[in-house]
Regions:
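Short, well-structured beta-strand segments within conserved domains
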Residues: 2, 13-26, 126-133
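Short, compositionally stereotyped local motifs that mark structural "simplifiers"
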Residues: 33-37, 42-245
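Beta-strand-rich interaction surfaces with strong enrichment in secreted/lumenal proteins
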Residues: 7-11, 118-120
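Aromatic sugar-binding surface patches on proteins
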Residues: 1-5, 115-117
Length: 245
């Protein structure tokens, strides 16, 4: 049997009676075997409510499951930026009944990943807050990312603490270089400049543009990471990330 899709010719159908004509041929003039039968299979729209589908199927039946709509995007009560005092952040979605999940470690929240939001979140230091909202039967939101930077944390960060949080010791064949340079802003004026820049470093950080890049550590600094292989080019080296200015 052979299935022939005639959807492309549906415009030829007319209201009322239509005739299906079939031309059948034997395989050879002397072939006594001949069988031909036709069956028409059509699908109608039973549910007139509009639905949204993840994959397009032009000219063919839609997927079995669809979405009734989109979950309203998440909003944060405090915007990303520089801060010096602790504060609380509220996350909302205008979609009634939506569940919000969030993370503090830079990982992506998902239907089964991250913590369920149930009230204001306390931010006491440099934090990357990511959130996503879900509701069954609807398209979830994208991931929103807000990075809150406390300069007091930045000026004292060092290599040991960074490595302890899971960052690699080496970038390929090069030793990793994390943290602030103690030769420039050593504590108590113990640096090459007698504390000159240590006194102004907090204001200096606020005076220049800052970019926050949030992504998987291995995809940034691992053996196939884009920082480790900074000379590589092309789509094969693109990585999923969130960037904030």
């Amino acid at each position: 049997f052979e299935d022939i899709v005639i959807t492309a010719h549906r415009a030829l159908l007319r209201a009322g009676e239509n005739v299906l004509a079939i031309h059948g041929l034997n395989r050879a003039p002397g072939d006594d075997d001949f069988l031909i039968t036709a069956e028409l299979t059509g699908e109608g729209i039973l549910d007139l409510a509009p639905r949204y589908f993840q994959s397009p199927t032009p000219g063919e039946a839609n997927e079995a499951d669809g979405f009734a709509g989109f979950v309203a995007d998440t909003s944060f009560s405090v915007d990303r930026g520089f801060y010096s005092e602790p504060f609380e952040v509220e996350i909302r979605s205008e979609t009634e009944g939506a569940v919000i999940r969030y993370t503090f470690d830079g990982s992506e929240p998902g239907p089964a990943a991250g913590s369920i939001y149930d009230g204001p979140l306390l931010i006491q230091g440099t934090t990357t807050l990511r959130a996503m909202a879900f509701l069954e039967g609807m398209v979830p939101t994208n991931i929103d990312t807000h990075t809150y930077i406390f300069p007091d944390d930045i000026v004292v960060q060092d290599a040991a603490a960074t490595i302890a949080r899971g960052f690699p010791r080496n970038w390929g064949g090069t030793s990793a270089d994390y943290g602030m340079d103690p030769d420039v802003i050593g504590q108590g004026g113990r640096d090459r400049f007698g504390g000159r820049y240590a006194e102004t470093i907090r204001d200096d950080l606020l005076a220049i543009p800052t970019i926050s890049v949030v992504m998987n550590i291995d995809e940034m600094f691992g053996s196939r990471g884009i920082y480790t292989n900074s000379g590589s080019r092309g789509r094969a080296w693109e990585r999923r990330s969130s960037i904030e200015l």
